[in-house]
Swiss-Prot record:
Assigned protein family: Belongs to the MraZ family.
Keywords of the record: Cytoplasm, DNA-binding, Repeat, Transcription, Transcription regulation
One GO biological process term: negative regulation of DNA-templated transcription initiation
Protein name: Transcriptional regulator MraZ
PANTHER family: TRANSCRIPTIONAL REGULATOR MRAZ (PTHR34701:SF1)
Domain of life (superkingdom): Bacteria
Xref: Gene3D superfamilies: Transcriptional regulator MraZ domain
Quaternary context: Forms oligomers.
Subcellular location per the Swiss-Prot or TrEMBL entry: Cytoplasm, Nucleoid
Residues in SpoVT-AbrB domain copies: 5-47, 76-119
Keyword Metal-binding: no
Amino acid sequence: MFLGTYTPKLDDKGRLTLPAKFREDLAGGLMVTKGQDHSLAVYPKEEFAARARKAAAVSRTNPEARAFIRNLAASADEQRPDGQGRITLSAAHRTYAGLTKECVVIGSVDFLEIWDAQAWAAYQEETEAAFSAAEDDVLGGLL
């Protein structure tokens, strides 16, 4: 399970060091793709494959489904962390997420998100008020 908030730096070659506690779960390979809200999503390879199969099962006659599948597949980049736990983020991914040197990696239960630090701070400020109010709507009283 991927939980927590981490603040690695992006180096001049576009490499990001993954949090040490997640490296074992990602050692077999991972997929980086566009995420929501101009973040990047990092999935263990098997999790990404399962999600891709579910997406592919949706009718391609639905224009929104086609667009989602195209964007998901076209932006996917397979990576394997190096010996220091680093992955290289493509220029296209760095541009999409507006990444600068200061990054934030957050755990989102079954995947990671990579954010530009300023974008993450702005997102948190924007959504903080709705966070507690959304618990019942999102979780439906499961907790």
